[in-house]
């Protein structure tokens, strides 16, 4: 399961996911990508292993575009049996000024450079993300950046 959460200024997103691996040999991968453009995001993702020989992976990554925003990401693993393999990765950080400077050196404006970094972070080209979702996310990011200029 892949989720993308975008929070423009003045918004608060509270996302909770719980995946139960209840059948022998079950597998799950949850990937959450969060972008705060001044809004607040709280993400809580849990993998529960209830039976033997299950595997699960959580990935929760957040990108802050403005220091006024906030991202809180809480990954949780609940192995209720001995033979479960569960793991997670999580990161939250500000947009990298060095990356912005690098892209601006090639003639991109700051807004275009930010949009490019966000799109790369979200990995919208991932074939597991439906085309309709990709288009919606791109439109939301563009609209939020446009509203900011008004």
Predicted regions located by residue number:
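Conserved beta-strand/loop scaffold segments within soluble protein domains that form the structured core
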Residues: 1-108, 122-124, 128-150
């Amino acid at each position: 399961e892949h989720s993308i959460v975008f929070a423009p200024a003045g918004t608060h997103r509270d996302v909770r996911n719980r995946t139960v691996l209840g059948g022998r040999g079950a597998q799950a991968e949850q990937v959450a990508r969060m972008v705060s453009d001044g809004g607040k995001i709280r993400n809580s993702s849990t993998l529960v292993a209830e039976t033997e020989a299950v595997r699960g992976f959580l990935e929760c990554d957040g990108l802050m575009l403005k220091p006024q925003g906030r991202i809180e990401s809480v990954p949780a693993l609940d192995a209720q049996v001995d033979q479960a393999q569960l793991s997670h990765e999580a990161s939250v950080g500000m947009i990298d000024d060095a990356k912005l400077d690098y892209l601006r050196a090639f003639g991109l404006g700051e807004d275009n450079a930010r949009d490019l970094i966000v799109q790369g972070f979200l990995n919208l080209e991932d074939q597991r993300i439906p085309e309709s979702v990709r288009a919606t996310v791109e439109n939301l990011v563009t609209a939020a950046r446009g509203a900011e200029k008004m």
